[in-house]
Amino acid sequence: MESNDSGGVAAKHGFLFQDCVAAYHVTRMLRDKTIRSVRCEVTDDIDIVSDGYIDFVQVKSTGKTRWNISDIVQNSKGADKKTIPCSSILHKSMQCESDLSLGRRYSIVTEEKVNKTLEYLTISPNARLDKPGRQELIDDLNKRTDNFLTDSGISVSDWIDAATWEVFSSLRELELLGIKNIRLASQDLHGVILSSETVAEDIWCRILDTVTRKGEHSRRIHSADDKSYLRPDLLEWFKQRVEDDQSRSGRKIYVKRDLPHILTPFRAPMASVCAKRKGQVLHQQYSLKKYRYKHIADNVCQWLDEVFLRPKEMSDIHKLTFIEKRERLKNSVFKSLHDVSEFLGRVLLHATIRQHHESQPIPCMLYVEKAGAEKILENVHIVRRDPEGDQLWIGFSELVTDINIAVRLPEIRDQLYEDISDCIDTARKKILDIKDDNYLLRHDIDEILDGSQPFDAHLDRFTFVLFVGYDSNLLTEPETPGFEDDLEKETAVLFEKFAADLIEDSPFANLCIHVFIYPAPSLERLTQLVDEKVREVV
């Protein structure tokens, strides 16, 4: 009996090749937030659902030396060896239907290369302008298919313009590309390097197993979602795999530093007249009728390295001796201790954003180019979103002690509006220059920092954050029980005053602004304790 790979061996290889292509696209989905899901055997062999379109993928793994134009228009034959009309690769691909709201793209994936007749399809659609071969290919295919047109009006020329041909020469090539995506996704999404190649290979095998099982589900019994790998499910599962690897390898994930909450939310967020204005009261509690000043001062010190050291300084700090660490931190912190109130506000705002949004801070102190050097912000954070574009949170703080908070809060708001109007473009450029992507998780904020685009083009991706502390007569030393309801009313009135300009049809109504209000018994006492504690620690 002749030994060859026809029949069952070839069929099994073909199914495995198709599943590896699907698994590869799932690993792409880890790093590409525009991909929403990868469907297995729903419409075509693989359907890649992205923002605005579906890419219908046909996978072929025959033992051809080279693919030519006749191969994609050759109709299949049925059980009686009669030709089945419109059953060729081209016909099937053209007839794939997407939702009315989504466009169509088409892909053919093979192990073998194409000859000159199909070479045009291997060119990236973005690079096809002025490339020869398009019209010749259209004319030839129209001739071979009698100017075939689908029921939904898709012509051969439509298909050509939306189609690409990809070649993966082996299963191993797909596996290596998928494993590369897995390792990069671990760094991009979670800021860590997987402990070994074995871990990445295991994740690949699990993804491959999942797409195989989804592809096997019956179309008659199961829904399209049952046969789809959805991005939210993938991200949640992948995060758990990375965290499991980190816990086994004993390494701490930097981006999830176990730092303490200095202040906590007081009741629910405040009601707002506008979705673009959000308010939250922060507080610290009493213990044995004494306000927890010491708790705040102690925990402020836990955040000093992250607030006052540059990313490279933090990454290198494990190499230093204890004395060197203290000296480096001391030099950075003492530069800011000349104004303890400003120092404290900066740390409290930083810790609040980090704890509540798992943000990535960009250490900087930006000054606007006005008359003199006036600081407009001290906290800049990237808040990642998925699948939406990442946001940039820009903020500053003020601890109000020498003026009525009800008077000062609207003034702070008006000053913010003025600074945004005059200086946001300068600030965007400086943030772009300052941030060091070597120490940040993968993000897409560069596009909103691009000065060639107006600030207004990305309003929904900027959030301005105000942290305002003040002395409240309702918080006494020692504690007067039962103050909570009155404190809620007092802070609600303050927030209403802050947002009152929106009722007057403010031109800044579309700015997204978060206000954190922090009432305390005595900010003067708190800043004094913080000053003493910080000098003691560093």
Swiss-Prot record:
Pfam families: Cap4_nuclease, HamA. GO terms for molecular function: nuclease activity. Coiled coil: none annotated. Keywords: Antiviral defense. GO terms for biological process: defense response to virus. Disruption phenotype: About 20% increase in T4 progeny; the phenotype is the same in a double abpA-abpB deletion. The keyword Nucleotidyltransferase does not apply. Interacts with AbpB. Part of prophage CP4-57. Part of an antiviral system composed of AbpA and AbpB; when both are expressed from a plasmid they confer resistance to phages T2, T4, T7 and lambda but not RB32 or RB69. Resistance is temperature dependent, it can be seen at 30 degrees Celsius but not at 37 or 42 degrees Celsius. The system impairs phage but not bacterial DNA synthesis (shown for T4, T7 and lambda). Partially suppressed by mutations in T4 gene 41, a replicative helicase. This is Anti-bacteriophage protein A.
